[in-house]
């Protein structure tokens, strides 16, 4: 049975930002490209917390080129993004998982735009922090953790300890939970633990709970300014070869740059690494929307690493661009 915690103070439950055209003089007017730009219109997004920081960065840069385009972005989780896109409430849903066949049959068209990963997070003040980081997580261990099979850290680590394990999961339908669950053969609805709303909610819960364990997208586990985990958080290594310890080639979690490099090289498994999508209802016809997608898949890729993401290979980019002209 999941216990629900609401973090109403975090991002007011839904992240929202708006980039509006300004009547005042700004630096874009001095840009020869922006000064002669004729693209106008509005673009609306909602959905995955995983993709939110990247879309905000793209929107900021896109508006420098196209200052007469208004962009509205809100979070809410991948489930909301998909629902809103199919209902045409927004132009593009932000979705952090594969598009289901039933969604595609309803008109959902997904454009892979960047890559990300879900990581296990732990409070750095955990009494068994060193043992956990030396041992890491295997698929079987993670499956048991999010099935409430471990009551104590003694159960988890096979040692003498009665310290309880507090496991956190997501309350909202989201790509992070689904991707994390798929890694060890489950679905989001099968994950047990204290259910918390949103990526920021899970990271905040683990930060406040010295015996807490959760999972987060990279951008909510690491501070992209310092590239280190957020204060109070650490990332639990994955024991990919399942030999009961974290080997040297599995140690790449101290900073986001090393983790991103490992994901790009395939040393971090996929899942829980995965592509992130912008989803429309059918082929988009709004010129501003089309140009935004093209921008994200071209010049926008150069902002991926600095924002905490992994650029797409050219083959994936080409596949997404092809969907604009079926």
Which residues does each predicted region cover?
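Short amphipathic alpha-helical "recognition" segments used for binding
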Residues: 6-7, 24
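Positively charged n-region of N-terminal signal peptides that target proteins for export
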Residues: 1-4
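Flexible loop/hinge segments at secondary-structure junctions
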Residues: 19-326
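Bacterial N-terminal signal peptides
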Residues: 8-15
């Amino acid at each position: 049975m999941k216990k629900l915690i609401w973090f109403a103070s975090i991002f007011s439950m839904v992240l929202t930002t708006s980039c509006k055209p300004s009547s005042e003089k700004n630096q874009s007017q001095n840009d020869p490209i922006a000064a002669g730009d004729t693209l106008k219109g509005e673009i609306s997004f909602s959905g995955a917390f995983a993709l939110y920081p990247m879309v905000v960065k793209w929107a900021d840069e896109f508006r420098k080129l196209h200052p007469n385009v208004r962009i509205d972005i809100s979070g809410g989780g991948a489930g909301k993004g998909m629902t809103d896109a199919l209902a045409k409430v927004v132009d593009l849903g932000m979705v952090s998982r594969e598009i289901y066949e039933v969604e595609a049959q309803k008109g959902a068209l997904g454009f892979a735009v960047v890559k990300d990963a879900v990581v296990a997070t732990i409070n750095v003040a955990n009494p068994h922090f060193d043992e956990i980081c030396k041992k890491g997580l295997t698929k079987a261990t993670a499956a048991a953790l999010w099935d409430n099979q471990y009551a104590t850290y003694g159960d988890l680590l096979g040692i003498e300890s009665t310290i309880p394990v507090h496991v956190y999961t997501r309350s909202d339908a989201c790509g992070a939970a689904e991707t994390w669950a798929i890694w060890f053969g489950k679905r989001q609805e099968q994950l047990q633990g204290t259910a918390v709303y949103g990526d920021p909610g899970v990271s905040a819960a683990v930060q406040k709970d010295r015996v807490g364990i959760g999972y987060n997208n990279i951008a909510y586990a690491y501070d992209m300014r310092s590239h280190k985990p957020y204060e109070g958080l650490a990332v639990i290594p994955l024991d990919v070869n399942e030999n009961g310890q974290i080997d040297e080639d599995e140690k790449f979690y101290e900073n986001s740059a090393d983790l991103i490099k490992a994901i790009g090289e395939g040393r971090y498994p996929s899942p829980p690494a995965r592509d992130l999508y912008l989803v429309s209802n059918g082929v988009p016809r709004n010129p501003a929307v089309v140009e935004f997608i093209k921008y994200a898949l071209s010049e926008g890729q150069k902002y991926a690493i600095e924002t905490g993401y992994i650029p797409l290979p050219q083959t994936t980019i080409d596949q997404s661009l092809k969907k604009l002209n079926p």
